């Protein structure tokens, strides 16, 4: 742990189209090599595809629901006690919760088979709103690990 002062959180401006801060953060997660325009095109393209597939659904609302569904409540951390490593379940802080859900959505979309990244992302977001998809599978896996190691929860950090 650093002993210096705590680093202040940078204020992230909301995205230009929807005025949503979470969407802006997700844009930064999707961005690679500083190419923000490409990330913006991918995300807005995915939201447009969601709008076309489900005209009754608000694409921004679908995005928020998907992010909230993928957020993990608990995760496991390794803790060494008496020469043995234990996987200790710990509650996830809200900031990390959001970061993990965005990262998992990105990774799950990458692994999909559709042609463009916008299509992959749109389908992954739609599946996440319904509680399916690669990102949801990842969250459930993390929750299962925490549940299986509940016996070691007294080794709190």
Swiss-Prot record:
Pfam families assigned to the protein according to its UniProt record, in alphabetical order: Ribosomal_S7
Sequence intervals crossing the membrane: none
Classification via CDD domains: uS7_Bacteria
Keywords: Ribonucleoprotein, Ribosomal protein, RNA-binding, rRNA-binding, tRNA-binding
One GO CC annotation: small ribosomal subunit
GO-annotated biological processes: translation
Source species, domain of life: Bacteria
GO molecular function: rRNA binding; structural constituent of ribosome; tRNA binding
Subunit structure: Part of the 30S ribosomal subunit. Contacts proteins S9 and S11.
Protein task: One of the primary rRNA binding proteins, it binds directly to 16S rRNA where it nucleates assembly of the head domain of the 30S subunit. Is located at the subunit interface close to the decoding center, probably blocks exit of the E-site tRNA.
Family, as annotated: Belongs to the universal ribosomal protein uS7 family.
HAMAP family in the cross-refs: Ribosomal_uS7_B
Identification of the protein by name: Small ribosomal subunit protein uS7
Organism: Delftia acidovorans (strain DSM 14801 / SPH-1)
Gene: rpsG
């Amino acid at each position: 742990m650093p002993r210096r002062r705590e680093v202040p959180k940078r204020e992230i401006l909301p995205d230009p189209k929807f005025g949503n801060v979470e969407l802006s953060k997700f844009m930064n997660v999707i961005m690679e090599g500083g190419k923000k325009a490409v990330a913006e095109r991918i995300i807005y393209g995915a939201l447009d595809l969601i709008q076309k597939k489900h005209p009754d659904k608000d694409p921004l609302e679908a995005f928020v629901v998907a992010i909230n569904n993928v957020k993990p409540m608990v995760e496991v951390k390794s803790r060494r006690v008496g020469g043995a490593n234990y996987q200790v379940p710990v509650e996830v802080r809200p900031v990390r919760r959001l970061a993990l859900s965005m990262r998992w959505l990105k990774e799950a979309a990458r692994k999909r088979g559709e042609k463009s990244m916008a299509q992959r992302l749109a389908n992954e977001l739609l599946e996440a709103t319904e509680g399916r998809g690669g990102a949801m599978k990842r969250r459930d896996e993390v929750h299962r690990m925490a549940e299986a190691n509940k016996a070691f929860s007294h080794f709190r950090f």
